[in-house]
Amino acid sequence: MSSDKLPTYIIHHSRDVLIQLLPQEGIAAELGVAEGAFSESILKYSRPRKLHLIDCWEHQDREDYLPDGNNVPEDEQQGRFESVSEMFAGQVSEGQVAIHRAFTTDAARGFERGYFDWVYVDAMHTYDAVLADLRDFSPL
């Protein structure tokens, strides 16, 4: 995998453009999987050797997260988790995909620093949560 193909700054691109710029055949993680739609794009365009899908799939009553469109009721969260598990069952059995039902801060503790070639951060969308994800999954 070569990071020299990835521009230093990517501005005003949609994630559908971004995914085509990410390194291929590496070890990657998606933080905040929701229904798994972008996970499919990651597999298609980035073709990672290993993709870790990390999401708590749990409704949160935090005031700062209540308005988020992916903070759906608990039964819908369970349905999303089951759907993602079914959607990627083949890749899980082949060892290409691992599904982690956990909060990102908890999941990060299970990986050594520098394990990932890249991480797509799209879990909780608050400043503090994104900063924590960047800190927890940083290779440094």
Language model features by range: what are they?
Residues 2-9, 15-140:
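S-adenosylmethionine/decaboxylated-SAM
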